[in-house]
């Protein structure tokens, strides 16, 4: 019998460019184990680098994926991130979510 776990993935905003605003969506989500998850960051400014982090309770942020080129698509296990062609957005996808995916996810542009 397969147990389904309710996962809560929360994320917040982080930007490294003074005065720049990043918009992330969704702000929070509830998903079932095994579901795919998509998150995105957008900005009115152009960035040369997009970074995705995860922070678990009681821990510091950990870099998951760094993107350096417009249009770049990078995978790391079940994680896939893309740097938008316009250099104003980035997307993070988690396939087949598992309970250890619960955490706070940050995007950063610089």
From Swiss-Prot:
**A Pfam family assignment:** V-set
> Per UniProt, which keywords does this protein have?
Adaptive immunity, Cell membrane, Disulfide bond, Glycoprotein, Immunity, Immunoglobulin domain, Membrane, Receptor, Signal, T cell receptor
Under InterPro entries, the record lists: Ig-like_dom, Ig-like_dom_sf, Ig-like_fold, Ig_V-set, TCR_alpha_variable
Q: Which residues form the signal peptide?
A: 1-19
In the record, biological process GO terms are: adaptive immune response; response to bacterium
Q: List the disulfide bonds.
A: 41-107
- Residues carrying covalently attached carbohydrate according to the record: 40, 93
Q: What does this protein do?
A: V region of the variable domain of T cell receptor (TR) alpha chain that participates in the antigen recognition. Alpha-beta T cell receptors are antigen specific receptors which are essential to the immune response and are present on the cell surface of T lymphocytes. Recognize peptide-major histocompatibility (MH) (pMH) complexes that are displayed by antigen presenting cells (APC), a prerequisite for efficient T cell adaptive immunity against pathogens.
Q: Which PANTHER family match?
A: IG-LIKE DOMAIN-CONTAINING PROTEIN, T CELL RECEPTOR ALPHA VARIABLE 39
What protein name is recorded for this chain?
T cell receptor alpha variable 35
> Which species is listed as the source?
Homo sapiens
The organism's taxonomic lineage, starting at the top: Eukaryota, Metazoa, Chordata, Craniata, Vertebrata
Q: Which gene encodes it?
A: TRAV35
């Amino acid at each position: 019998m397969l147990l389904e776990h309710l996962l809560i993935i929360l994320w917040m905003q982080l930007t490294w460019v003074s005065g720049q605003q990043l918009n992330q969506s969704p702000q929070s989500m509830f998903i079932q184990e095994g579901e795919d998850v998509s998150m995105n960051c957008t900005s009115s400014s152009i960035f040369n680098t997009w970074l995705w982090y995860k922070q678990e309770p009681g821990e510091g942020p950990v870099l998951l994926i760094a993107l350096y080129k417009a249009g770049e698509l990078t995978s790391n296990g079940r994680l896939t991130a893309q740097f938008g062609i316009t250099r104003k957005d980035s997307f993070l996808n988690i396939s087949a979510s598992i309970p250890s995916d619960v955490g706070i996810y940050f995007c950063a542009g610089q």
